[in-house]
A protein has these predicted regions:
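Conserved C-terminal guanine-recognition region of P-loop GTPase G domains, centered on the G4
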Residues: 103-153
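Inter-motif core of Ras-like GTPase G domains
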Residues: 84-107, 122-124
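Conserved beta-strand segments of the P-loop GTPase G domain that flank and frequently precede/overlap
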Residues: 76-78, 100-105, 130-134, 159-161
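Switch I (G2) and immediately adjacent beta-strands of P-loop GTPase domains
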Residues: 40-84
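Canonical P-loop GTPase G-domain recognition
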Residues: 137-194
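Conserved G1/Walker A P-loop phosphate-binding module
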Residues: 1-49, 61-63
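Short glycine-/polar-rich loops that comprise or flank the Walker A/P-loop
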Residues: 8, 95-98, 125-129, 153-156
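Conserved catalytic network of the ASCE P-loop NTPase/AAA+ motor domain
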Residues: 52-53, 61-69, 90-95, 121-126
């Protein structure tokens, strides 16, 4: 008789202002989403009414893994996108297992900032990266945007429409694949499966 195993992974959901980070977490979370949204002020108020100032938090569970005995828990931590709250990203990225970087394909004016953010987030992390290109239906366009942000060719890139929960689940599927691949690589390098 096998015993039930619990696998919990921390996912950092980050990216520029109004990219769709909160939308992703709200679309896929199986628990009530904890948000720290307040009314947006200044020029940004014309883009969206509310903005995250500390973090968003949601969970996703996948039961029945490995002959029904294991459960995978994803703990999703969303960062603020505004520069003045950027320090929260450094706090939230501690002990992260995967970074999901969300960028809005319809906001090319944010790409330079997104490139800088991505470099800052990943510079000291050795974890998988998934780039979710929101408001995009084309794999080619999504790949071109991710390349422009400095993502390596090996990075998973997914076009998505994060107002649609099904699209959010596709992003989660990419996160799970990235976790599986990184776990397999780690086990192989430690003499695990071959």
């Amino acid at each position: 008789m096998s015993s039930m195993t619990d696998h919990t992974f921390k996912i950092l959901v980050t990216g520029p202002f109004a990219a769709g980070k909160t939308s992703l977490i709200q679309a896929v979370s199986q628990s009530p989403v904890v948000t720290t949204e307040v009314a947006t002020t200044g020029d940004e108020a014309s883009v969206k009414a509310n903005t995250t100032v500390a973090m968003d938090f949601g969970t996703f569970e996948l039961d029945g893994v490995d002959d029904g005995e294991d459960t995978i828990h994803l703990l999703m931590f969303g960062t603020p996108g505004q520069d003045r709250f950027r320090f929260m990203t450094d706090i939230l990225k501690a002990d992260v297992d995967v970074v999901t970087f969300v960028v809005n394909a319809e906001a090319p004016e944010s790409f330079a900032e997104a490139r800088e953010m991505l470099a800052l987030v990943m510079h000291d992390l050795k974890v998988p990266l998934v780039v979710a290109v929101n408001r995009c239906d084309s794999h080619e366009q999504a790949r071109a945007i991710a390349d422009g942000l400095g993502a390596l060719p090996s990075v998973a890139v997914i076009p998505c429409q994060l107002v649609d929960p099904a699209s959010g689940r596709e992003v989660v599927a990419e996160v799970l694949v990235a976790l599986l691949q990184s776990t397999e690589l780690a086990l192989t390098s430690q003499g695990g499966f071959r």
